[in-house]
């Protein structure tokens, strides 16, 4: 199809692939459609219990490539990349916020959000320890204060890998 926007292609790919990947035991974490170094690239980020390895990425690539070819809704030639979401995994669904409770996260809102914690000013960014998802809001501990950020106000949320903490645990 001509004239499909970048976001629309990612949404269509998600709708097409999510049920297939779930059937095979994978979670479709994110889909990116972007022009990189002059070429279109479709990135599919997957996860599963226990983590994702190179064999998983190859298997998913072999599964989804023919599905995308048959659907044939992406007009320009593109490269397909399948990978794990990485150490800074995005968090989107309510279950993501419960699954990673106890981990350090960074949350960014679409705009300033007031009243996320008693006496706190309106803010757009939070970094703290994720407590979970309750009553339509993400809860996180920021320097000892519990903040509740409405899920529909979150533009982006990611795990934050603590390199220093990991190194301390290895000593």
Swiss-Prot record:
Q: What Gene Ontology cellular-component terms does the record carry?
A: cytosol
Q: Where in the cell is it found?
A: Cytoplasm
Q: What keywords appear on the UniProt entry?
A: Cytoplasm, Ribosome biogenesis
Any single Pfam family the record assigns to this protein? DUF150_C
What CDD domains has UniProt attached to this entry?
A: YlxS_C (cd01734)
Q: InterPro entries of this UniProt entry?
A: Ribosome_maturation_RimP, RimP_C, RimP_C_sf, RimP_N, RimP_N_sf
The main location class comes to: cytoplasm
List each coiled-coil range: none
The disulfide bridges present are none
Residue span of the signal peptide, if any?
A: none
A GO term (biological process) for this protein? Answer: ribosomal small subunit assembly
Q: What PANTHER family does the record tag this protein with?
A: RIBOSOME MATURATION FACTOR RIMP
Q: Which HAMAP family match?
A: RimP
Task of the protein? Required for maturation of 30S ribosomal subunits.
Q: Which family does it belong to?
A: Belongs to the RimP family.
This chain's protein is named Ribosome maturation factor RimP
Source organism (scientific name):
Anaeromyxobacter dehalogenans (strain 2CP-C)
């Amino acid at each position: 199809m001509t004239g499909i926007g970048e976001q629309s292609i990612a949404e269509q790919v998600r709708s097409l692939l999510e049920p297939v990947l779930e059937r095979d035991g994978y979670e479709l974490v994110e889909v990116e459609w972007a022009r990189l170094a002059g070429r279109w690239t479709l990135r599919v980020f997957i996860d599963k219990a226990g983590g994702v390895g190179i064999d998983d990425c190859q298997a998913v690539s072999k599964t989804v490539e023919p599905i995308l070819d048959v659907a044939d809704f992406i007009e320009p030639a593109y490269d397909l990349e399948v990978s794990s979401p990485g150490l800074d995994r995005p968090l989107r669904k309510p279950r993501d916020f419960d699954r990673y409770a106890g981990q350090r996260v960074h949350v960014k809102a679409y705009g300033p959000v007031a009243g996320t914690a008693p006496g706190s000013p309106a803010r757009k960014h939070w970094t703290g320890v994720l407590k979970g998802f309750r009553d339509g809001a993400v809860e996180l501990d920021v320097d000892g204060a519990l903040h509740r950020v409405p899920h529909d106000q979150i533009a982006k949320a990611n795990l934050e890998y603590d390199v220093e903490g990991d190194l301390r645990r290895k000593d």
